[in-house]
A protein has these predicted regions:
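Classical Sec-dependent N-terminal signal peptides that target proteins to the secretory pathway
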Residues: 1-17
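Terminal low-complexity, poorly structured segments
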Residues: 2-4, 26-29, 263, 272
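A metal-dependent hydrolase signature that marks the N-terminal structural subdomain at the beginning
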Residues: 15-162, 166-167, 276-287
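Active-site-flanking segments in enzyme catalytic domains
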Residues: 75, 92-109, 131-287
Length: 287
């Protein structure tokens, strides 16, 4: 799920559910894929450092929507909070700030447990989903990766919040908020939200993406029909499953390959042509 600014929303999500609502979908939800990343799989996480505990309601956030809310335009509740602050450093030097809401974790021990859990898992997904495709080095550089939105910076901040709400990503802050109490397949939803912040804009504005969508003629999940951004975000986990996971179910693999061959081919080419890192995963990209 993603929340966008007005201009950004009209640009990257030009295709809405109106064009897809009657299209066939293969899986009811992303969770139907089941967990594909195991605890013992390698992680690019180098270290997790506790920085401080904030005071006087230093941070501001907007809560996720309830699970029964179907309209993403519904008003979200905003609130101030304090947090245990951690920095997760990855092998490339990339840093993600974790803010663990003290209303969720009352003490440092619990906060560190959850920060480490998600920092490690973020280190297990392909690097380009975590670290983005646009580099900012004093000034914006497009790096020949397509038009995009100028926001594909990767994941800078992850908020770990209290409550049973839907996770969601915020382009403007390069962050997403997650809720451990929500019963998601966490590896899949982490990749989904990370995709919003790393490749969503580049892919939805790439001239070769929508022809691939049309050629497939269907969507991988029911939710992927919401708009083009959610299509990208849900599709990425299925691409990872068939290209990067050893011993993945042959039955599921064949079903996915048959359902969205053109999207998968696009993603293979996109990763190869732009020399995107999939570390720590080794992915079998097709010609």
């Amino acid at each position: 799920i993603i929340v966008l600014g007005l201009v950004l929303s009209s640009y990257t999500n030009a295709g809405t559910s109106n064009e897809a609502k009657n299209k066939k979908y293969i899986y009811k939800s992303l969770d139907d894929l089941k967990t594909i990343i195991k605890k013992e799989n390698p992680s690019d996480l180098k270290e997790l450092k506790f920085i401080r505990k904030s005071e006087n309601k230093e941070f501001f956030a907007t809560a996720g929507l309830g699970h029964g809310v179907k309209d993403n335009r519904k008003k979200r509740s905003a609130y101030e909070y304090d947090a245990f602050v951690f920095h997760a450093i990855y092998n490339s030097g990339f840093k993600i700030t974790f803010l663990v809401d003290i209303d969720f974790a009352k003490n440092l021990e619990k906060a560190e447990k959850y920060a480490f859990k998600y920092a490690k898992l973020m280190g297990q997904i392909p690097s380009f989903l975590r670290e983005g495709t646009t580099k900012f080095d004093g000034e914006y550089k497009d790096a020949n990766l397509g038009v995009g939105t100028g926001t594909e910076r990767g994941v800078k901040i992850i908020v770990i919040g209290k409550g049973n709400y839907r996770w969601w990503a915020d382009f403007n802050q390069a962050r997403f908020i997650l809720y451990p109490s929500a019963k998601y397949q966490e590896d899949l939803i982490l990749m989904h939200e990370s995709a919003h912040l790393s490749i969503h804009g580049k892919i939805t504005t790439n001239i070769n993406w929508y022809p691939a969508v049309l050629a497939d003629g269907k969507y991988i999940t029911k939710y992927a029909r919401t708009n083009r951004g959610e299509d990208v975000a849900d599709t990425i986990s299925f691409w990872v499953a068939v290209r990067c996971i050893e011993n993945f179910s042959e039955k599921k693999k064949n079903k996915i390959l048959k359902a969205i061959p053109n999207r998968l081919k696009f993603l293979d080419n996109y990763v190869k042509e732009n020399k995107l890192s999939t570390s720590p995963m080794v992915c079998d990209l097709k010609n």
